[in-house]
Amino acid sequence: MKALIVGLGSMGKRRIRLLKGIDPTVEIIGVDMTAERRNQVEEMGHKTYSSITEAAAEKPDVAFVCTAPVAHYVIIKELLENKINTFTELNLVKDGYEELMNLAKENDTVLFLSSTMLYRGELTFIDNEVKAFDKPVTYIYHVGQYLPDWHPWESYKNFFVSNKRTNGCRELFGIELPWILRTFGPVKDLYAVSDRMTGLEIDFDDRYFVTLTHENGTRGVIMVDIVAPKAVRNLEVMGEGLHLFWEGNPKALYKFNTETKEKDFINTYETFEHDSRYSDNIVENAYVDEMQNFLNVVAGKEEPKYSYEKDLYTISIMDRIEGIE
């Protein structure tokens, strides 16, 4: 297999490393306009180019788009026009969605969208518990981390999360909403308030408080921020006879035992991998699982867990939260 990685920053390098773990024989080709990044990947033993046009001549079987979201549309379009099965990181904006979906169908090409949290073992357990409970629940969820700490090796000003269209809070909603909508269902109504409390050089709000009412009667409160000094992912789900707790990592998932009145630890991973450069709530296993899902979709063995069609709805909720018409 020959794989093209477009965008050789931290995420592109992660995809290379994980892809080689899935298939050590895979041939990697990299594309990036920055010479320094190309040199780093060439030192890893991989061929690189400065343009997709050059790389497409190598006839890759699949491509992974790991650039800033605002650049995705143009890149994905070129890849699909070259009939390359394409995996893309979160888009956060719906630029060209209808065109890209139609182009993929016309060229019989896979168009696959990342949604890593759907592959987390803890959230699969929570999803199963909530659906088996089969009654409305209440949930409280806080997700946050101080923006400069996301990529401590570079300035947040040079990172797409400083762009108002793809800002840090929107990125967090883009990561979390797909699993929330899968587990709790479509949204009937929402109310959101936001403001800015930090001294960061940004032109968007840095904290959001959102109340969601789902069509099935479930209600939830979500707090998202780019303020918290310690990375936070805290979830509590409760109903009459159900109480779940999760602190964002595989070592912190609990279900309340109504008989013993104790919290029972739920183990969803035999082993899990973690990149020490990131907070402890980022688990590598989920990234591997979604990449394997993509490769199996290309091979005709599986259906994707997420799609551009589903993401259009997710983005519509994000736009409502941010007050975008």
Specify the residue positions occupied by each region the protein language model found.
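Beta-strand-loop-alpha-helix segment that lines the small-molecule cofactor/substrate pocket
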Residues: 62, 68, 73-118
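Predominantly a Rossmann-like dinucleotide-binding segment in NAD(P)-dependent oxidoreductases
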Residues: 117-193, 198-201
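C-terminal helix-rich "cap/oligomerization" subdomain common to oxidoreductases
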Residues: 62-65, 286-325
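Short acidic low-complexity segments
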Residues: 46-58
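N-terminal Rossmann-like dinucleotide-binding module
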Residues: 1-44
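Contiguous beta-strand/loop segments that form the cofactor/metal-binding neighborhood of enzyme cores
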Residues: 172-252, 281, 288-301
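Glycine-rich, N-terminal phosphate-binding loop of Rossmann-like dinucleotide-binding domains
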Residues: 66-67, 143
